[in-house]
């Protein structure tokens, strides 16, 4: 068993970049300071997790802690994460463009609502896949889940390969028949339930809880 702290970050279009990224850092700082007293949590045994855009925030948070030499999470769980907004065309060229739930063209829509300045898409906060190598070395261990029917499929695998090449302990699991967001379907999908269970076991082992 573990305690879970769910963070509500500000959303676009009411607030734009980098509000959600700032919120992720603020939440991490608060948890580091308060978790022990409030919830009896060991700050040295905390993981971060996020799906889709939340996976972007989790990946960025880990990189920022490396860059700033701050307290790093012990583990990162990235669920079909959004890891680059630099070139939406790479999503469109992928066979996974025809995903049932979400498409690359929809990411163009998201990008326009979050980024007031489209040239910021190469900012390391928006595209952690392309962050400098010095921000990637020393990252906490990672487990990355990707889906077969998802325009984010390729960048998830690319990030896993990149982290491994830099000595970061990284595993990935591909659910080839599933689509983006499938972990929200545990009430109707046995595959989603199995994936959620496996992700929990992997995280628990990484934190020394299993």
Predicted regions and their residues:
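Alpha/beta-hydrolase superfamily serine-hydrolase fold, recognizing
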Residues: 1-210
């Amino acid at each position: 068993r573990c305690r879970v702290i769910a963070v509500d970050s500000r959303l676009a279009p009411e607030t734009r970049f980098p509000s959600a990224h700032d919120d992720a850092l603020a939440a991490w700082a608060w948890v580091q300071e308060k978790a022990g007293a409030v919830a009896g949590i060991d700050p040295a045994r905390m993981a971060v997790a996020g799906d889709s855009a939340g996976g972007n925030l989790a990946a960025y948070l880990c990189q920022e802690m490396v860059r700033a030499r701050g307290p790093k999470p012990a583990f990162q769980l990235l669920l079909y994460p959004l890891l680059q907004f630099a070139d939406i065309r790479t999503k469109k060229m992928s066979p996974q463009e025809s995903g049932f739930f979400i498409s690359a063209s929809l990411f163009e829509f998201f990008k326009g609502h979050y980024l007031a300045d489209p040239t910021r898409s190469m900012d390391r906060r928006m595209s952690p896949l392309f962050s400098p190598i010095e921000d990637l070395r020393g990252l906490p261990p990672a487990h990355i889940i990707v889906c077969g029917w998802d325009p984010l499929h390729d960048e998830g695998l690319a990030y896993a390969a990149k982290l491994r090449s830099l000595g970061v302990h990284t595993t990935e699991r591909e659910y080839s028949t599933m689509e983006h967001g499938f972990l929200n379907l545990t009430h109707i999908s046995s595959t989603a339930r199995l994936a959620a269970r496996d992700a929990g076991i992997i995280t628990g082992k990484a934190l020394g809880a299993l």
